[in-house]
């Protein structure tokens, strides 16, 4: 009899332990799901604030009041919306180096300006031109055509056609991930200019153009009314916009877009999207 009671007690204890474990597992699962839901909700909110930042930037670019108008020269603007802090940066695409139009000397200058080694700049600039041109002749002083890609063990050759995406730059012979990352903020496919517009150019682009970047950037920062202070008011019609939203809980989202203002194929839209990247960790 005592043996049966002891066995029953052990069984009850095992059942209690099992139920406790099940309850704990259920509570943990519920907690994890709640946290996941909260993260998804906060992430979605952060993305919407980042999108709102882009829309707000476009409205400030077209403001009729010069004092209220934002300048598309790369300076950072901060905007508060509800509990989100939004940091916005706008660059007129005409101030960047157009990969399909720039001369080799300008491309080489940009490579040097972002830290590319001497000697490599000319070779890489030639390879960029060889990628986009329609012939099979290597650029003087450097470059890369199909045979050079084959010798490097790559399964592709020079495109012999215009760049269609900025990502193609990473495929050019001699380009590495670090240099690509440094060049990316300063190049475009949308200006159609062989030489960037200095009013909106970043420091490395100004240096590549042979201009005094320090002096020109200082003039942009001068208060309105002083010489050079209104140089970057206005702009063309194509802008790259980076909008970074951070919620009070710490959740962050980034939107990077290239947009062309004016008539759009989409009814009711005041701009056309040319490039769009968003998320928590846009590269």
From Swiss-Prot:
<comment type="similarity">
    <text>Belongs to the GSP K family.</text>
</comment>
<keyword id="KW-0812">Transmembrane</keyword>
<dbReference type="InterPro" id="IPR038072">
    <property type="entry name" value="GspK_central_sf"/>
</dbReference>
<keyword id="KW-1003">Cell membrane</keyword>
<dbReference type="InterPro" id="IPR049031">
    <property type="entry name" value="T2SSK_SAM-like_1st"/>
</dbReference>
<comment type="subunit">
    <text>Type II secretion is composed of four main components: the outer membrane complex, the inner membrane complex, the cytoplasmic secretion ATPase and the periplasm-spanning pseudopilus. Interacts with core component XpsG.</text>
</comment>
<dbReference type="Pfam" id="PF21687">
    <property type="entry name" value="T2SSK_1st"/>
</dbReference>
<keyword id="KW-0997">Cell inner membrane</keyword>
<keyword id="KW-0472">Membrane</keyword>
<feature type="propeptide" description="Leader sequence">
    <location>
        <begin position="1"/>
        <end position="6"/>
    </location>
</feature>
<keyword id="KW-0653">Protein transport</keyword>
<dbReference type="GO" id="GO:0005886">
    <property type="term" value="C:plasma membrane"/>
</dbReference>
<dbReference type="InterPro" id="IPR005628">
    <property type="entry name" value="GspK"/>
</dbReference>
<keyword id="KW-0813">Transport</keyword>
<protein>
    <recommendedName>
        <fullName>Type II secretion system protein K</fullName>
    </recommendedName>
</protein>
<feature type="transmembrane region" description="Helical">
    <location>
        <begin position="9"/>
        <end position="30"/>
    </location>
</feature>
<feature type="topological domain" description="Periplasmic">
    <location>
        <begin position="31"/>
        <end position="283"/>
    </location>
</feature>
<keyword id="KW-1133">Transmembrane helix</keyword>
<comment type="function">
    <text>Component of the type II secretion system required for the energy-dependent secretion of extracellular factors such as proteases and toxins from the periplasm. Plays a role in pseudopilus assembly and seems to control its length. Interacts with the pseudopilus tip complex that is critical for the recognition and binding of secretion substrates.</text>
</comment>
<dbReference type="GO" id="GO:0009306">
    <property type="term" value="P:protein secretion"/>
</dbReference>
């Amino acid at each position: 009899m005592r043996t049966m009671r002891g066995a029953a007690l052990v069984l009850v204890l095992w059942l209690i332990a099992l139920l406790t474990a099940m309850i704990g597992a259920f509570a943990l699962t519920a907690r994890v799901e709640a946290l996941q839901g909260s993260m998804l909700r906060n992430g979605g909110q952060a993305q919407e604030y980042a999108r709102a930042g882009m829309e707000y930037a476009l409205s400030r670019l077209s403001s009729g009041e010069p004092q209220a108008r934002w300048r598309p020269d790369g300076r950072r603007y901060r905007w508060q919306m509800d509990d989100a802090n939004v940091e916005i940066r706008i660059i007129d695409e005409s101030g960047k180096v157009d990969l399909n139009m720039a001369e080799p000397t300008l491309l080489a200058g940009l490579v040097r300006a972002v830290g590319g080694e001497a000697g490599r700049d000319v070779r890489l600039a030639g390879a960029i031109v060889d990628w986009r041109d329609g012939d099979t002749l290597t650029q003087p002083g450097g470059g890369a055509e199909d045979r050079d890609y084959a010798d490097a063990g790559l399964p592709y050759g020079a495109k012999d056609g215009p760049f269609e995406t900025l990502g193609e730059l990473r495929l050019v012979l001699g380009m590495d991930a670090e240099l690509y990352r440094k060049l990316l903020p300063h190049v475009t496919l949308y200006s159609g200019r062989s030489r960037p517009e200095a009013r909106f150019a970043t420091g490395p682009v100004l240096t590549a153009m042979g201009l005094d970047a320090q002096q020109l950037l200082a003039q942009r920062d001068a208060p309105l009314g002083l010489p050079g202070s209104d140089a970057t008011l206005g702009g063309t019609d194509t802008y790259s916009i980076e909008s970074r939203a951070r919620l009070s809980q710490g959740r962050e989202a980034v939107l990077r877009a290239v947009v062309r203002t004016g008539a759009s194929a989409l009814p009711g839209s005041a701009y056309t999207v040319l490039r769009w990247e968003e998320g928590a960790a846009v590269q």
